[in-house]
A protein has these predicted regions:
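Charge-rich, low-complexity N-terminal segments
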Residues: 1-28, 44
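Residue-level signal for secondary-structure boundary elements
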Residues: 23, 38, 121-122
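Short, conserved beta-strand/beta-arch hydrophobic-aromatic motifs that form part
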Residues: 24, 41-94
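Charged, well-structured alpha/beta interaction segments
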Residues: 31-42
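Well-ordered alpha/beta subsegment
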Residues: 86-122
Length: 122
């Protein structure tokens, strides 16, 4: 858990205006389809911040931020792996990390999220 959630100015300084726009568009797209709890955390060794979408104790996906870079991660559990079987498997599932620089993959991200969990907003 973070002591202080980064504001727009801090995020823009970290990742740049164009990536901050991508971040906001991706968040808006997820928020449009899913009603989730959103949690800010430290980003571990590789990232400055983590912004996680969770519901019922399960993570849907997470966005990550570090200097001049945005990450989008989906972890597919065993059930989802039956539908998707090409990446390395870790103890808690397959970790798919993307580093979007534009919106071109957003519809693919939504399809992957749909494999993990059906949208709960109409």
């Amino acid at each position: 858990m973070l002591d202080k959630i980064p504001n727009a100015e801090e995020m823009t300084a970290l990742i740049g205006q164009s990536l901050y726009d991508i971040w906001n568009k991706l968040c808006a797209l997820i928020d449009e389809k899913y009603d989730m709890e959103c949690l800010w955390n430290k980003g571990g060794k590789a990232w400055t911040y983590e912004y996680k979408y969770r519901r019922g104790g399960k993570t849907l996906c997470a966005l990550y931020a570090r200097e001049n870079c945005v990450g989008f991660m989906i972890i597919l559990g065993k059930d989802e792996q039956l539908k998707f079987d090409t990446d390395k498997t870790y103890h808690d599932g397959k970790w798919l990390m993307f580093e979007p620089t534009d919106t071109s993959m957003f519809q693919d991200f939504i399809k992957l999220l749909g494999i993990k969990r059906k949208p709960n907003k109409k």
